[in-house]
């Protein structure tokens, strides 16, 4: 604040020295009229009041290992390039039914941040017909307590668990999918010929845009989350006799 004050004073003094005064306006040798200084003081007071009342940039502060919720402009969520079907901001937990998780969850108190053509996502691999099974078993849940994550540069960042939007606290949820077990059956992946193949199930990742903070600067960043369970195969070495 003091820096702004000194800057305004300096700018004015430079302007006073550079202003071409006429004889009829300010006679040579006379000081600047008191009314002029009064006008200057009024201008400075107005500038300082505006500086004090101007909203500061949102900075997240860490308290006991957690991050305080920060105020976010709701217009920020209208940028389509930031949309992800796996990220949700809500004042209440998303539905967690055993059959499906509705990604178009639009109950009161939810930011329509994740609109997508995929209206529903299964929380577990479904069995469509009798006798059909998944090679790997997975489970999908909304994660609302994520505090840290790895960004696309491989750097660990702090995830903003909560943000303040229009004086309401919204929690940031991530829809994550991971493997139930690395070996659904004793030999590895289900349905794989273990005589010729080694196999195991593993969780894969993708990057989504999320609100994070790093070195007290809040910003959108790509972070890595679990998104699928796949089977990894490797051919067994054959002995040549």
Swiss-Prot record:
Name of the protein described by the UniProt record: Beta-nerve growth factor
Chief site of localization: secreted
This protein's record includes keyword Secreted: yes
Localization per Swiss-Prot or TrEMBL: Secreted; Endosome lumen
A Gene Ontology molecular function term of the record: growth factor activity
Position of the signal peptide: 1-18
Subunit structure as annotated in this protein's UniProt entry: Homodimer. The homodimer interacts with a single NTRK1 chain. The homodimer interacts with a single NGFR chain. The NGF dimer interacts with a single SORCS2 chain (via extracellular domain). The NGF precursor (proNGF) binds to a receptor complex formed by SORT1 and NGFR, which leads to NGF endocytosis. Both mature NGF and the immature NGF precursor (proNGF) interact with SORCS2 and with the heterodimer formed by SORCS2 and NGFR (via extracellular domains). The NGF precursor (proNGF) has much higher affinity for SORCS2 than mature NGF.
